[in-house]
Amino acid sequence: MENNNSGEHKTNDDRLTDIFSSVGRQYRLTDVTAQFVAFRDLKIRWQRSYKMADFMVSDYLDDAPDGILWDFADTIIAKIFAENDSDYSNSVIEWISSDGFRARKQPIYLRRSKNLTRSPVGREKNLLDSYGRLVDDGLVEEDPGLCISWMKSATARKIGHCSVVMDVVALSG
C-alpha cells in the first residue's frame, strides 16, 4: 500500500483504477474499474458496455511507475475506441523489456507455469547443449537470463512454449 498526499492509504488497485478512470474520461467513460490480476502471462482483459469499462491488468505491472501505467492505459483505451493503431510507448516497452523487470518477474512467471519441469535436462537430451550449439554457430546471442525448460506433459498439438517478455523457452519431449 502506498500513501498519497491526502494521507489516505491507497491500494495498487485504487491507483490503477484512478489512472484508468482518468484516461477513460477522455473517451466519455464514466464508470471505470481496474484491478491487478495474477495471470500467468503478461496481458490485460477488459469488458466494456456503453460508458462502463472494467479492466483486469496482469499483476506483473503492479510495481510500474505511474507514468508507465498512464501510457499503458492510454494505449489500451485508445485501441478499444479504435482511435490509436500505434504500439505501446517507448517508455512502456523499455520498462517491460528491461533486465530489472525480467529479474523481478521471471521467477513469478515460472511459479505460475505449472507445466514446466524448470530444468533443461531431459531423459535423453540436455537443452543447454542444443542452445550452446546455436550460440556457437552464431544463430542466437547468448542470454544469461534465458530460462530453458522441458514441459512436464506433452500434447499432440503443442511442441513448445515461448515467452519473449519473460525470457522463457519450453519444449515438450
Regions found by a protein language model. Give the residues of each.
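Active-site-proximal or metal-binding-adjacent scaffold patches in catalytic folds
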Residues: 1-173
